[in-house]
C-alpha cells in the first residue's frame, strides 16, 4: 500500500484486489504486535484512506483503536518493544512515526514526548543505536524517519552525541558502490531503509510533507486493469523466443 501510494496507484484496485480491506480486521492486524499496528496506521494515513467495512464476525478496526493499542503497549521507560521489558530503538521509532499525526490528542502527545526522550537516551556515543545487542544502519534509518515525522531537526541537541548526529552515523554505513550495509556488508533491507530515511531528510530540508504523507504524490491516470485475465493477456502478448538456448540476457 505504501509503495503503490507513493507511485500514485490505487491500492483499492490492484488487479481486482482491494488491498486496504485486510486492514479493517482489528484482531488480525494487531495479533502480530505493536509494529503491525504501527504500519497499518502508516498505510492508512499515507493516502488518507478510509478503513473499509470488515467481514461479518470480525472486529471492525478504527484509527482510534490502533492508536489506543499502541498507547497501551508503551513501556514504563517511555519506549516500545516486542517481547522485552526495555525499549527497543527500532520499535520505538516505528510507533512514533505512526503516532506523529495524532498529537492533537493529549494522551498521544504525552506518549510521543516520553518516546522521544527515551530515543534520545538510547542513542550511543557515536550517534548510532543498538538493537538486540547489535548496532546497525537500520536502527539509524528508523530514528531519522521518526525525527522527520515529528519535525525534529537532524541537528537537535537531543540527538547529537559527541558531535555525531544519527544522520552522520547512518552515512558511515554507506559502501563505495552507494549501497548500505547492515553491519559490514551489503544488505538489501538496510539499503532500502537508508534510502527511505535519506529521502525523508531531503524532504524535511526542502520543507515538503513528511515521508509517509503521500497525498501529494502524482496520481496515475491510466485506466485500471480489471482482474487477473487482463494481466494474463498482457503476458501472452509479450514476444517469445523459439530457441532461447543461445539467447543472452
List PLM regions with ranges.
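An alpha-helical repeat/solenoid feature that recognizes helix-turn-helix modules
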Residues: 1-13, 29-63, 68, 75-113, ...
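Terminal, non-catalytic domain-edge segments
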Residues: 169, 183-241
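Alpha-helical scaffold repeats of the Armadillo/HEAT/TPR superfamily
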Residues: 18-21, 58-61, 65-66, 111-115, ...
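Gram-positive cell-envelope targeting signals
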Residues: 194, 248-249
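Solvent-exposed, low-complexity, repeat-rich "mucin-like" stalks and linkers
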Residues: 242-248
Amino acid at each position: 500500500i505504501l509503495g503503490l501510494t507513493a507511485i500514485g496507484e490505487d491500492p483499492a484496485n490492484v488487479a481486482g484486489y482491494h488491498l486496504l480491506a485486510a486492514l479493517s480486521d482489528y484482531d488480525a492486524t494487531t495479533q502480530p504486535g505493536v509494529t503491525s499496528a504501527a504500519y497499518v496506521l502508516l498505510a492508512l494515513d499515507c493516502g488518507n484512506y478510509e478503513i473499509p467495512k470488515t467481514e461479518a464476525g470480525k472486529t471492525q478496526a478504527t484509527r482510534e483503536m490502533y492508536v489506543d493499542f499502541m498507547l497501551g503497549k508503551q513501556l514504563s521507560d517511555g519506549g516500545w518493544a516486542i517481547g522485552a521489558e526495555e525499549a527497543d530503538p527500532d520499535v520505538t521509532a516505528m510507533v512514533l512515526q505512526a503516532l506523529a499525526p495524532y498529537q492533537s490528542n493529549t494522551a498521544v502527545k504525552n506518549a510521543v514526548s516520553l518516546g522521544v526522550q527515551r530515543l534520545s537516551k538510547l542513542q550511543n556515543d557515536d550517534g548510532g543505536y543498538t538493537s538486540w545487542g547489535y548496532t546497525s544502519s537500520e536502527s539509524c534509518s528508523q530514528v531519522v524517519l521518526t525525527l522527520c515525522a515529528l519535525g525534529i531537526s537532524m541537528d537537535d541537541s537531543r540527538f547529537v552525541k559527541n558531535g555525531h548526529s544519527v544522520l552522520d552515523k547512518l552515512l558511515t554505513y554507506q559502501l563505495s558502490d552507494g549501497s548500505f550495509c547492515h553491519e559490514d556488508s551489503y544488505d538489501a533491507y538496510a539499503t532500502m531503509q537508508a534510502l527511505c530515511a535519506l529521502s525523508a531528510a531531503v524532504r524535511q530540508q526542502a520543507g515538503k510533507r513528511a515521508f509517509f504523507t503521500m497525498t501529494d504524490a502524482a496520481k496515475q491516470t491510466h485506466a485500471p486493469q480489471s482482474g487477473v485475465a487482463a494481466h494474463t493477456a498482457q503476458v501472452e502478448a509479450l514476444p517469445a523466443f523459439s530457441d532461447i538456448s543461445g539467447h543472452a540476457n
